[in-house]
């Protein structure tokens, strides 16, 4: 077996491009090699800011061979009466690229035809790779592309060299004016090159030993963590590792060297969040804390070289960070000299969204919506909820958030505490933007949960009223995240809340607006949007799609109820008699669905005892009369597992009804009475789930 390596050398790529680039290269090469019939071990991909590398340590040097029988025209038109070949047969041979002598007769179920055997494959893998490599490189997707020089070729950053080796042979091709060869370049300081690679198998040794490059991202990450931990422990602390920043940092360096710097202890008067954000956002550095979780006057950064004078480099980093922290301290002191009243007045000059007014208008709506929500869910501190809504956006015009926009909400909570607001109000302001993503926690406080719901509902109502409905991947106002956030908060806090009523109230608080969609139409679309996202959330949480759809079809205005019903139905589905129960109740639901629309008499679920002539229908009526009070009591308690247990008890009686009674009797009175029996049953069933939507 042979070895292959491809290195795409560029100017520094953004760190965020590297994970997707590695995935694309692995998937595209794996697919292209399989399509070409080139057998190889799994494709390995690694990357640094200046290179993307594809390696295969065991590649078949020759394409797989196969034989294919190609059928031509029927023998009766391929041969003359004398046995010679007709023009049709000669044309077939010419089309297939074979000699006429290769034609033979083939008997099939449809008769006798002519055919040829074609031998496929057998090409040299290196020859096939000459076409595969440039095709893949040119098709790689990037968030942004650029041109350089005078050519039209585009890539994420200017391409400077291409190394492509199959064993010791160069895979010769050209992309964007750059021709492949056996030359690579190492770290700009520790092994710039050019470096010659004699064989594909030598590449990694050369780039590591001569080039001073650590080509594998996971190795760079581990080196940062190991070295950083050692430095922090020596200083009596531990590094505050942040995974997203760690991933970014390893993608910024080829030769990672952790470096521990110091900050003036006086800066520790700043809030922890401000210090960490200053370090992380501007300097790509990590904070250091002691065993009690208190910040220490140190930071950890990662260099892209081993410096000749480590102290000099460290002092340079300290000087730059000090300037950042001086700015942060200025904003902190300036903001503390201001007040929420001043900020709220300024919010009237900050636009929320076009026709939707100012951020000041939004805070006044949130004040009312939070108070309404508190009453709806039975929260006993409506005053705190309303106050949190009113102050929620004040920090947007503060100096600190103007400098560090990721601290919005967080700084509002900190300032609220410093300015004497109640703890519930401060906590709610700090938590208002949670959850920030699918894996982010929801607000921990009830006041924060209500403010977060109100904020998201207000945004959703306004955007849908303006026709700003997400389509495809486009969602500039993160409305999908808003919906998922509302659903998660309701589920995780166990709130009994009518979301349709929530959205209607949010629309009403806007008053008269120049809506693009009438509020009633926008509400319908918002309900559909919410149900679709709730469906996705339940499925992502591991529930079967059919069960989710059956529960949501029974109603999802009360998200807590929908979640509890789904959990109970999932448990019921694991019972041995589940399939039988579904078939029974599905039959009842389907009959009512069909006959309810066709019947001349409206079905209201009220049957007449004097029209119960069969034992089976009398037994069903008696069972329903006994069950309904139990059902209604359990429904009021929200005991859905017990409700599904009731259905299990009832199933044999319903089966007996279907076996012993002709529902669609010729007697109209009997038919209507029997349909009403089923309507009474289905009316209760449909509160739990739409059994007609289940498939067995």
Curated annotation (Swiss-Prot):
**Top-rank taxon, per record:** Bacteria
Sorted keywords for this record are: Aminoacyl-tRNA synthetase, ATP-binding, Cytoplasm, Ligase, Nucleotide-binding, Protein biosynthesis
UniProt KW ATP-binding keyword = yes
Which Pfam families would you find in this protein's record? DALR_1 (PF05746), tRNA_synt_2f (PF02092)
Query: What biological process terms from GO does the record include?
Result: arginyl-tRNA aminoacylation; glycyl-tRNA aminoacylation
What does the entry list under GO cellular component? Answer: cytosol
Q: Which reaction does it catalyse?
A: tRNA(Gly) + glycine + ATP = glycyl-tRNA(Gly) + AMP + diphosphate
Record keywords: Ligase included?
yes
Q: Where in the cell is it found?
A: Cytoplasm
The subunit field of the Swiss-Prot or TrEMBL record says:
Tetramer of two alpha and two beta subunits.
Q: Which family does it belong to?
A: Belongs to the class-II aminoacyl-tRNA synthetase family.
The protein in question is named Glycine--tRNA ligase beta subunit
Lineage of source species: Bacteria, Pseudomonadati, Thermodesulfobacteriota, Desulfovibrionia, Desulfovibrionales
């Amino acid at each position: 077996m042979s070895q292959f390596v491809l290195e795409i050398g560029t100017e520094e790529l953004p760190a965020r491009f590297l994970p997707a680039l590695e995935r694309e290269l692995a998937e595209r090469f794996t697919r292209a090699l399989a399509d070409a019939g080139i057998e190889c071990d799994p494709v390995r991909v690694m990357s640094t800011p200046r290179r993307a590398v594809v390696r295969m340590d065991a590649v078949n040097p020759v394409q797989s061979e196969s034989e294919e029988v190609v059928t031509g025209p029927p023998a009766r038109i391929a041969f003359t009466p004398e046995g010679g070949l007709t023009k049709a047969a000669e044309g077939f041979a010419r089309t297939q690229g074979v000699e006429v002598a290769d034609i033979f007769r083939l008997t099939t179920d449809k008769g006798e035809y002519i055919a040829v055997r074609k031998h496929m494959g057998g090409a040299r893998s290196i020859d096939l790779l000459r076409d595969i490599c440039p095709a893949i490189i040119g098709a790689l997707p990037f968030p942004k592309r650029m041109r350089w020089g005078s050519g039209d070729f585009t890539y994420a950053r200017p391409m400077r060299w291409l190394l492509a080796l199959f064993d010791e042979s160069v895979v010769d091709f050209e992309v964007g004016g750059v021709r492949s060869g056996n030359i690579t370049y190492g770290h700009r300081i520790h092994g710039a090159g050019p470096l010659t690679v004699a064989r594909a198998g030598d590449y990694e040794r050369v780039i590591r030993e001569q080039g001073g490059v650590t080509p594998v991202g996971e190795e760079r990450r581990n080196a940062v963590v190991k070295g950083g931990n050692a430095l922090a422990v020596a200083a009596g602390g531990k590094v505050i590792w942040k995974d997203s920043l760690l991933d970014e940092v390893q993608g910024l360096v080829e030769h990672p060297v952790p470096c521990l710097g110091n900050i003036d202890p006086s800066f520790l008067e700043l809030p922890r969040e401000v210090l960490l954000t200053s370090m992380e956002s501007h300097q790509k550095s990590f904070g250091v804390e002691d065993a009690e979780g208190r910040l220490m006057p140190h930071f950890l950064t990662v260099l892209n070289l081993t410096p000749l004078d480590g102290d000099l480099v460290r002092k340079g980093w300290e000087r730059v960070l000090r300037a950042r922290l001086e700015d942060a301290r200025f904003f902190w002191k300036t903001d503390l000299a201001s007040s929420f009243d001043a900020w709220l007045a300024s919010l009237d000059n900050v636009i929320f969204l076009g026709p939707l007014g100012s951020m000041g208008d939004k805070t006044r709506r949130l004040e009312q919506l939070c108070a309404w929500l508190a009453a709806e869910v039975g929260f006993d501190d409506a005053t705190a909820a309303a106050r949190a809504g009113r102050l929620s956006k004040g920090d947007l015009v503060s100096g600190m958030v103007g400098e560090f926009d990721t601290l919005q909400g967080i700084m509002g909570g900190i300032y609220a505490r410093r300015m004497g607001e109640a703890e519930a109000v401060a906590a709610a302001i700090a938590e208002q933007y949670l959850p920030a993503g699918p894996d982010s926690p929801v607000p921990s406080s009830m006041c924060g949960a209500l403010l977060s719901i109100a904020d998201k509902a207000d945004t959703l109502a306004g955007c849908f009223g303006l026709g700003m409905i997400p389509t495809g991947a486009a969602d500039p106002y993160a409305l999908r995240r808003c919906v998922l956030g509302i659903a998660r908060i309701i589920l995780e806090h166990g709130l009994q809340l009518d979301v349709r009523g929530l959205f209607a109230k949010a629309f009403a608080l806007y008053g008269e607006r120049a809506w693009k969609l009438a509020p009633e139409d926008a509400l319908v679309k918002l309900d559909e949007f919410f149900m679709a996202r709730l469906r996705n959330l339940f499925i992502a949480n591991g529930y079967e799609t059919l069960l989710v759809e059956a529960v949501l079809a029974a109603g999802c205005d009360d998200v807590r109820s929908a979640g509890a019903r789904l959990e109970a139905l999932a448990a019921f589905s694991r019972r041995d008699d589940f399939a039988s129960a579904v078939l029974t109740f599905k039959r009842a639901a389907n009959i009512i669905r069909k006959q309810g629309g066709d019947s001349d008499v409206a079905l209201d679920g009220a049957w007449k005892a004097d029209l119960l002539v069969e034992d089976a229908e009398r037994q069903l009526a008696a069972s329903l009369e006994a069950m309904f009070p139990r059902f209604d009591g359990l429904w009021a308690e929200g005991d859905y597992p017990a409700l599904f247990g009731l259905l299990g008890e009832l199933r044999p009686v319903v089966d007996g009804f279907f076996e012993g009674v002709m529902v669609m009797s010729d007697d109209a009175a009997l038919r209507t009475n029997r349909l009403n029996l089923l309507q009474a049953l289905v009316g209760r069933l449909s509160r739990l789930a739409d059994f007609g939507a289940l498939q067995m």
